[in-house]
């Protein structure tokens, strides 16, 4: 099965990219939206996700890898969790404004379903965001 791509959101004041880098790996839990939780359940080991800072500095800042999928949320086993580790920081953050302005990203779930905290990213969207990070 091929690698799938995702986007996970975090408020940097609560848990930032730097926090993840310092920890090396973390349990991604506390998701209480059914669609987002189903996305967590669909993740497989080796899948990659964009790490998105929400609220302040809105933008994609890095790439993480799913290291342990299919875990129950320790606070409520009816919900899902995964373990993730940082892979790399983007050359530069890709802001939400840039994503919204890019016509090839008009259907990205980050824009269409703005409140969704865990979203699937299509291969073309993944590649385009990586291109934007290099410009």
Positions of the model-derived regions?
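Generic structural hydrophobic/aromatic packing signal, biased to beta-strands
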Residues: 8, 28, 64-66, 84
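Contiguous surface segments at macromolecular interaction interfaces
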Residues: 1-12, 73-135
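Short beta-strand-centered aromatic/proline hotspots
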Residues: 59-69
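Intrinsically disordered, low-complexity segments enriched in polar/charged residues with Gly/Pro
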Residues: 27-29, 57, 105-106
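A generic structural signal for short beta-strands and their flanking turns/coil linkers
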Residues: 4, 24, 45-47, 60-62, ...
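Short, charged beta-turn/beta-strand-edge "cap" motif at the junction between a beta-strand
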Residues: 52-58
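Hydrophobic beta-strand signal
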Residues: 50-51, 65
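Compositionally biased, charged N-terminal/linker segments
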Residues: 1-45, 135
């Amino acid at each position: 099965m091929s690698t799938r791509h995702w986007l996970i959101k975090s408020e940097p004041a609560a848990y930032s990219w730097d926090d993840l880098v310092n920890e090396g790996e973390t349990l991604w839990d506390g998701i209480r939206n059914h669609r987002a939780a189903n996305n967590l359940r669909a993740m497989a080991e080796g899948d990659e996700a964009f790490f998105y800072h929400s609220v302040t500095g809105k933008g994609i800042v890095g790439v993480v890898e799913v290291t342990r999928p299919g875990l129950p949320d320790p606070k409520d086993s009816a919900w899902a969790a995964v373990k993730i580790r940082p892979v790399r920081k983007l050359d530069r953050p890709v802001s939400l404004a840039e994503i919204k302005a890019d016509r090839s990203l008009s259907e990205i779930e980050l824009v269409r379903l703005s409140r969704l905290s865990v979203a699937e990213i299509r291969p073309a969207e993944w590649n385009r965001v990586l291109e934007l990070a290099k410009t």
